[in-house]
Amino acid sequence: HLLQFNKNAIPFYAFYGCYCGWGGRCCFVHDCCYGKWDIYPYSLKSGYITCGKGTWCEEQICECDRVAAECLRRSLSTYKYGYMFYPDSRCRGPSETC
């Protein structure tokens, strides 16, 4: 949910270069946090994301999304549309493990 504050995450980042999707850099920590979407309370004030009170699991998932959203925001200036739907076969090196 929080990724929407940077760009619509699915079309812009799901298959972006070697940096998002399974095995990507900004998305790596996010991928390790969980493998499904969930709903949780959060707010956006002055460009800062704040996770609200919820169950322990909701708060942890929100924090995973917050960190990923901030990572993507820091990378916006280097976003290149040519890397959308980039083939995995062009990525070099082993993927990290969680």
From Swiss-Prot:
List the PROSITE patterns hit by this protein, alphabetically: PA2_ASP (PS00119), PA2_HIS (PS00118)
Q: What is its cofactor?
A: Ca(2+)
Which residue ranges run through the membrane? Answer: none
- Cellular component terms per the entry's GO annotation: extracellular region
Locations listed in the record: Secreted
Tissue spec? Expressed by the venom gland.
Looking up CDD domains in the UniProt record yields: PLA2c (cd00125)
Q: In what way is its activity controlled?
A: Inhibited by divalent cations different from calcium ions (cadmium, magnesium, manganese, zinc), since they act as competitive antagonists of this cofactor. Crotapotin F3 from C.durissus cascavella rattlesnake venom and antihemorrhagic factor DA2-II from D.albiventris opossum sera inhibit its enzymatic activity.
Q: Which coarse location class applies to the principal site listed for this UniProt protein? A: secreted
> Known catalysed reaction(s)?
a 1,2-diacyl-sn-glycero-3-phosphocholine + H2O = a 1-acyl-sn-glycero-3-phosphocholine + a fatty acid + H(+)
Q: What is its EC number?
A: 3.1.1.4
Looking at the keywords, is Metal-binding present? yes
Q: How does activity depend on temperature?
A: Optimum temperature is 25-37 degrees Celsius.
The effect of pH on activity is described as: Optimum pH is 8.0.
Q: Which residues form the signal peptide?
A: none
Cysteine pairings via disulfide bonds: C18-C91, C20-C27, C26-C71, C32-C98, C33-C64, C51-C62
Residues the entry annotates as binding Ca(2+): Y19, G21, G23, D31
- UniProt function note: Snake venom phospholipase A2 (PLA2) that induces myonecrosis, when intramuscularly injected into mice. Does not show systemic myotoxic effect (after intravenous injection). Does not show cytotoxic activities in myotubes and myoblasts. Induces marked paw edema after subplantar injections. Also induces an increase in vascular permeability and in the levels of TNF-alpha, IL-6, and IL-1 cytokines.
Q: Which family does it belong to?
A: Belongs to the phospholipase A2 family. Group II subfamily. D49 sub-subfamily.
Q: What is this protein called?
A: Basic phospholipase A2 Bbil-TX
Q: Which organism encodes this protein?
A: Bothrops bilineatus smaragdinus
Q: What is the lineage of its organism?
A: Eukaryota, Metazoa, Chordata, Craniata, Vertebrata
